Design a protein with these regions (language model features):
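Accessory "access/gating" subregions that flank catalytic or transport cores
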Residues: 167, 172-176, 180-194, 208-215, ...
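ATP/Mg2+-dependent ligation/transfer catalytic cores
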Residues: 1-196, 386-446
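Core alpha/beta catalytic barrel or barrel-like domain that forms the active/cofactor pocket
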Residues: 131-139, 155-170, 190-210, 240-257, ...
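Acidic, glycine-rich loop-and-beta core segments that form the ion-binding/anion-interacting portion
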Residues: 205, 218-289
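Catalytic-core signal marking the mid-to-C-terminal active-site face
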Residues: 232, 238-239, 265-317, 321-446
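Short, hydrophobic beta-strand segments
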Residues: 96-102, 206-212, 259, 345
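A generic structural motif
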Residues: 23, 101-107, 172, 212-218, ...
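Short beta-strand elements
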Residues: 149-158, 255-263, 320-322, 329-335
Length: 446
């Protein structure tokens, strides 16, 4: 066990430790144990099938090509940079995110955090370092204990449920001040650096921006923030949901990813020339996103619900056009100075696994840079007036991803195989559900 972790446990009087890893869906899985036992561990173990568990808790019937037939153990190694308190726990509790390896020391190819590490190593080999800043949208809703009923906005301090369409309203955020006070305190206790909090367009829909920085650290923060928001909401008898489209008549929720690249030696942006103009690498990064994001859609929109958000009638992208300060485009270049020139990927849903989404977005840009791709001309009008070019269902997106050789090469064939097996299994389970729409319109009409 690294000495930094032992010291943290001692200094904070920790009695219990949550050893966690993010699975394919971004769910925290792992083990909880006494701090004394955790400090003695020299390689905790879990079955490798943990990465093949679906969001419903099931497993694919055929896992050939994704894992060993014996379902061997994998070894967990604690990352000392990730040790934090669990501020909502009743007892002094710590949480530590782990990386996953096989017994021979080889990294587990289907582990999402390891996939992001692999992409960052490709950048580092060329003297580059990505800088990212995720924005996460989410809804607050009343507790929903019967999934057959639609979700409802919660009642705030005024005693009224919010009707919606309160973009940037301070008063609408103030309705839930006690919840956000807890959320901010929880985040501060975990070194989750929230830059801003705003009210979005939907009823009780919020957005937080994380302060830009190292891609792996920001993925950790986004992963932990989702858990934190849910815990804070539960304290106030609400749910915080990161579903991409929780309400039929409200906007969906996204995870916008701002990304740039700096030179590891000079720390200057490779997206800008010395005279401040956009560089060739900047345009190639955009071109890589344009070419490969449609192939990677299943990684950014990972659930059947994700595709309800992708609509020209909602405030969400429907294609991979790019533009300067254009929020209708899938790829937006915000107004900035040369040092902070960046690209905002607006395609990923809030339901995406942060490690996978950030790894994917950076991988697509990387491919454009190393292949010297050229982007289309920037769009000046509304991208919603142009054709929808993104996959329209999880089934279509998964098939497209499975056939993408460039993405398998950069993200790892083992990961793509495991991920598509999981998504195919989830889609098959979804097809077994008969919806209320089918009963309403088909029961007596066909």
């Amino acid at each position: 066990m690294p000495n930094e972790i032992r010291q943290f446990l001692h200094d904070h009087g920790i009695s219990e430790v949550e050893a966690i890893i993010p699975d394919m869906a971004g769910i925290a899985r792992g083990k909880i144990m006494p701090a004394a036992k955790f400090a003695e561990e020299e390689g905790m173990r879990l079955p490798e099938s943990i990465f093949l568990q679906t969001v419903t808790g099931d497993y694919p019937s055929d896992t050939s090509g994704a894992m060993s037939p014996t379902e061997m153990d994998i070894v967990l190694k604690a990352d000392p940079k990730t040790v934090r308190r669990v501020p909502w726990a009743a007892e002094p509790t710590a949480q530590v995110i782990h990386d996953c390896f096989y017994a021979d020391g080889k990294r587990v190819g289907m582990a999402p955090r390891g996939v992001l590490r692999g992409v960052l190593e490709l950048y580092a080999a060329r003297g580059w370092e990505p800088i990212v800043a995720p924005e996460l949208e989410f809804y607050l809703v009343e507790p929903n204990i019967d999934a057959d009923y639609p979700l409802k906005p919660p009642v705030g301090r005024s005693g009224r449920a919010e009707p919606g369409r309160q973009s940037y309203s301070i008063a609408a955020v103030n309705e839930f001040d006690p919840l956000f006070d807890d959320m901010y305190q929880f985040c501060e206790d975990q070194d989750i650096e929230i830059d801003t909090l705003i009210h979005e367009d939907g009823a009780a829909q919020m957005e937080i921006n994380l302060l830009h920085g190292n891609a792996l650290d920001l993925a950790d923060q986004a992963f932990l923030f989702k858990r934190t928001a849910r815990e804070a909401a539960l304290r106030h008898k609400m749910y915080a949901t990161f579903m991409a489209k929780p309400h039929a008549k409200e906007p969906g929720s996204a995870m916008h990813i701002h990304q740039s690249v700096v030179d590891t030696k000079t720390r200057k942006s490779v997206f800008s020339n010395p005279d401040g103009s956009p560089s060739a690498l900047f345009f190639s990064h955009i071109a890589g996103l344009q070419r490969y994001l449609p192939q990677a859609m299943a990684l950014l929109a990972p659930n059947v619900n994700s595709y309800r958000r992708i609509s020209r009638f909602q405030l969400s992208p429907i294609n991979v056009h790019w533009g300067y300060d254009n929020r209708t485009a899938g790829l937006r270049v915000p107004a900035s100075n040369p040092e902070s020139r960046r690209i905002e990927n607006r395609i990923a849903g809030a339901d995406a696994n942060p490690y996978i989404a950030i790894a994917t977005s950076l991988a697509c840009g990387y491919l454009g840079m190393v292949e010297g791709l050229k982007p289309t001309e920037p769009i000046t009008g509304s991208a919603h007036d142009l054709p929808l070019t993104l996959p329209r269902s999880l089934d279509e997106a998964t098939r497209t991803l499975r056939e993408s050789e460039p993405l398998a090469r950069i993200l790892g064939a083992a990961f793509i195989t495991a991920y598509t097996i999981v998504k195919e299994a989830e889609y098959e389970v979804f097809l077994q559900v008969i919806s209320s729409w089918e009963r309403e319109h088909l029961l007596l009409n066909v």
